[in-house]
Amino acid sequence: MMLNSLPCKDILWAYMRREGADKTGEKQLIINYLVIITRRQKRYKFDMTEQEVQDCLRLLKVLNPDLAVGFPKGSRLPLQNLPNTRDLGALMTEDGLHILPRKLLRSGEIYHASIADTRILSEEYNVKTVIDFRSAAEVKKKPDDIMAGVEYYHIPIRDEERSGNSFFERVMSCYGDGERYMRERYRSLITDEYSLKQYARFLDVLLHVKNGAVVFHSTTGEDRTGVGTALLLFALGVPKETIRRDYMRSNPCLEEELKYMRRLYRADRPENSRKLADLKAFYQVKESYINTVFDVIEKENGGIERFLRRKLYLTPKASEELKKKYLI
């Protein structure tokens, strides 16, 4: 079997592919394959039972912890206390390449990670870098529980001297138009000089990490992380519609969080129940928010390539290195 002759360290990505599934309901032969992709961009396919594929994937991961496993396409990680932690792996670029799974993980705060969550991130996803987009005040209140051997980068996206205000105070300041407030907030994330420098630093860190997976996160993983993810995916050549779909995945992930915040808000500010609509604007992403980002990039900066080069200082050489590092 050819699999026996492939050095494990030469394998970059392995996943199961199922062929023959028929949505019409008619019986059809279903074949499971183990798909292996090597550092030389060679692709191999092995006909196996589903159990054999799963056994091989587990063994390969033990032999090579850096190996990317699975075909997540932006799906949520199976974690207990982190509802919006997602793997950007397997998202496809415009030229047909894929992001390597288990390398780029977007998330909300990881302060509430359970022991089981920490084990999964450390052992199964081989997390070696954490990038924290939150303010110093947010970090002080809920610091990340950094795992052994993990490098931590604090890159606050918003200028703390100007951001101020607690979460509930921001809700109260919306004056019944939370969506307008959020669109302006998104606009500031890619026009404010301080925020742009921080996003540029984020891309630079991604470019220079040595090995393992990177978790980058804010508080809920929607806004600062959502914009950062969009900029990263643009830099990797992922099409706009794919970026929009990934962005909108935060809503089902945060349904329970929104319910909890509604209860908390009612208890804290019972006299302002009419503000609950504005609270929803904070805890749900909307296409109009990310479209604001797209419009600023395209209409005010001459397109994404010009924006990446002039605003985020991503040179053509750095762009190619980033793609080489995370795409296959």
Please provide the spans of the model-predicted regions.
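Cys-dependent protein tyrosine phosphatase-like superfamily
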Residues: 2-215, 228-328
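Ser/Thr-glycine-rich phosphate-binding loops at phosphate-binding pockets of nucleotides
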Residues: 219-225
